[in-house]
Swiss-Prot record:
Cytochrome c2 is found mainly in purple, non-sulfur, photosynthetic bacteria where it functions as the electron donor to the oxidized bacteriochlorophyll in the photophosphorylation pathway. However, it may also have a role in the respiratory chain and is found in some non-photosynthetic bacteria. It comes from the Bacteria. PROSITE patterns: CYTC. The keyword Transport applies. It comes from Rhodocyclus tenuis. InterPro entries: Cyt_c-like_dom (IPR009056), Cyt_c-like_dom_sf (IPR036909), Cyt_c_ID (IPR002324). This is Cytochrome c2.
Length: 92
């Protein structure tokens, strides 16, 4: 399955890019931040579905909320696994 196409269809790429900050954090930042963390996948699936804010305010220079997304749990899980598999990028 092509998760980048799913990310495009679901509107994720309006605010995210694998390699650079757009409105939200680069997916490579997310991959680095959560690498090896127990429970990271479930935490991020919940965040993709319900929305969230506050994690990346320092790096983004503002408190930018991510809205709840119109995805199923299965779609959110596919997207999160894809994001976590991407090349990790420093977010200093």
């Amino acid at each position: 399955a092509d998760e980048s196409a799913l990310a495009q269809t679901k509107g994720c790429l309006a605010c995210h890019n694998p390699e650079k900050k757009v409105v939200g954090p680069a997916y490579g930042w997310v991959a680095k931040k959560y690498a090896g963390q127990a429970g990271a996948e479930a935490k991020l699936v919940a965040k993709v579905m319900a929305g969230g804010q506050g994690v990346w305010a320092k790096q983004l220079g503002a408190e930018i909320p991510m809205p709840a997304n119109n995805v199923t749990k299965e779609e959110a899980t596919r997207l999160v696994k894809w994001v976590l598999s991407l090349k990790q990028i420093d977010y200093k």
